[in-house]
């Protein structure tokens, strides 16, 4: 079973993604902010991380920087999911090492397809 870590502080998004990915046979882990995600990543090794940019404590950009510094986590596929839709934000996210940058609002169905494409 593939593992996915969803990192977002919006409960409705988390609930929708958790439900959908579980339905698609993923083991799902949830973090509400970057620090919680980094704590989970100490004990779990997901195949994919869906990462919001704007979060309390540690934002998504800083979280990805920490992930990429960790040899154990470098292989994880990362998708930014954010309302920040300016070119500079997208470029920054991809430059930090994200595989995709998806802008909110988004299609959950398409996101699942993108995740599946990344891990094949």
Explain the meaning of each model-derived region:
Residues 30-48:
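Acidic, metal-coordinating helix/loop segments flanking the phosphotransfer/catalytic sites
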Residues 55:
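Receiver (REC) domain active-site loop signature in two-component systems and cognate sites
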Residues 106-115:
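C-terminal output helix
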Residues 11-29:
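Two-component/phosphorelay signaling modules centered on CheY-like receiver
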């Amino acid at each position: 079973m593939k593992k996915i870590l969803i990192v977002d502080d919006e409960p409705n998004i988390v609930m929708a993604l958790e439900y959908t990915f579980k339905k698609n046979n993923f083991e799902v882990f949830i973090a509400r902010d970057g620090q919680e995600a980094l704590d989970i990543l100490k004990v779990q090794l997901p195949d994919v991380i869906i990462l919001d940019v704007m979060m309390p404590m540690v934002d998504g950009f800083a979280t990805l920087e920490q992930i990429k510094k960790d040899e154990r986590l470098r292989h994880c596929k990362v998708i930014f999911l954010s309302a920040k839709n300016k070119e500079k934000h997208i470029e920054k996210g991809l430059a930090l090492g994200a595989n995709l940058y998806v802008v909110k609002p988004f299609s959950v169905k398409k996101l699942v397809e993108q995740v599946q494409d990344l891990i094949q």
